[in-house]
Regions:
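Beta-strand-rich N-terminal accessory domains
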Residues: 1-79, 227-248, 256, 294-311
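Extended, loop-rich substrate-binding clefts of extracytoplasmic carbohydrate-active enzymes
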Residues: 23-28, 98-150
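Short, hydrophobic/aromatic beta-strand segments
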Residues: 54-56, 165-171, 312-313
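Beta-strand-rich interaction surfaces with strong enrichment in secreted/lumenal proteins
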Residues: 74, 144-146, 285-290
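Acidic/His-leaning functional-site neighborhoods
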Residues: 107, 213-288, 309
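Short, acidic/polar linear motifs in exposed loop/turn regions
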Residues: 163-165, 306
Length: 316
């Protein structure tokens, strides 16, 4: 089945839609957007790149940052917001001349299923290797992404090697979390983790103590085992809990004011209003090998709750 275009929205709604719960609508990118909704909240997912564009729990502020309305971005451009799917490479570790963060975020995904109950609304998307993906990465694969809205937002990515040779993968979910002010945030769950700092003059591995108060540009790359984190947003008085599986690293990133190359993407002060907390496998030993027929699962669940004092920050 070919990847759907805007003209396919009516057929998608007949086959996979449910009024008020699962609705496909056109976009200016000639690739539909699916809206998932229920009593707990709503989310929008673009079929181009399988990128979650928004997530809003009922009665609460949006959880995800998007610098510009989706329909105002150039067709095929990188969307620096929402939750990009980074696969089969993370950051700039792909082949020479390749795009940032892999091929999955630049491809049109198919819809293969949907379901809903009183408490959960879910859509299943799929992407297979083809002549276009082979131009950037010459391997056969199949990806399946399930996005569901319940009391939390959940993304579950399964990657399968459908070829005859093993390949190496780095991957990640790259959520941009909306915050009132970057300098009023901190990340819990990294105490005791070994980490590297992309901007530090010393490049060795060190051990982190306490929570991470986000105050500067760059990335902290944590080696994680617990895989339970909390982004405390003291400006909005809320906590965003992130639980993941299948990742060996956690990247906490913000471009900062000094990153001039990011101004076009985020606007003059957009950097102040998001923090990325990214469950991933980075371009070091944290990647994994997939033999023919093997699969790997990466999962992330996000829940936004008021900061009522039940979640306590631990400063260094």
């Amino acid at each position: 089945m070919k990847a759907p275009r805007n003209a396919d929205c009516e057929a998608l709604n007949r086959r996979f839609g449910a009024p008020g719960r699962i609705v496909f609508r056109p976009s200016k990118h000639d690739a539909p957007i699916v809206v998932l909704a229920n009593q707990y909240g709503s989310a929008e997912v673009a079929l181009f790149g399988a990128q979650t564009l928004s997530y809003r729990p009922t009665g609460n502020p949006p959880v995800l940052y998007l610098p510009h309305p989706y329909d105002e971005t150039p067709a095929g451009a990188e969307i620096h917001g929402g939750i990009p799917v980074c696969w089969p490479w993370f950051a700039r570790c792909g082949p020479a001349g390749s795009k940032l963060h892999g091929v999955a975020r630049y491809a049109r995904w198919r819809v293969t299923g949907s379901e809903y109950s009183e408490d959960v609304t879910e859509v299943t998307l799929a992407l297979e290797s083809d002549a276009e993906t082979w131009k950037a990465w010459p391997h056969d694969f199949a990806l399946e992404l399930k996005v569901s809205v319940s009391m939390k937002l959940t993304l579950a990515l399964r990657a399968t090697n459908t070829g005859t040779e093993a390949f190496h993968v780095t991957e990640g979910f790259h959520p941009y979390f909306l915050v009132r002010e970057r300098d009023q945030t901190e990340v819990l769950g990294v105490d005791g983790c070994e980490f590297t700092d992309t901007r530090a003059p010393e490049k060795g591995v060190r051990t982190w103590t306490g929570s991470y108060a986000v105050r500067e540009a760059g990335s902290k790359i944590y080696q994680v085992t617990k895989r339970e984190y909390v982004l405390m947003d003291h400006g909005l008085n809320r906590a965003i809990a992130v639980v993941s599986r299948g990742n060996a690293r956690l990247v906490v990133w913000n471009p900062g004011e000094e990153s001039a190359d990011q101004v076009a993407a985020f606007g003059v002060d957009g950097w102040r209003h998001f923090v990325c907390v990214e469950p991933c496998s980075t371009p070091d030993e944290a990647g994994y090998d997939l033999k023919p027929g093997e699969s790997h699962d990466l999962l992330m669940a996000v829940q936004s709750v008021p900061n009522d004092g039940s979640v306590h920050a631990r400063h260094p």
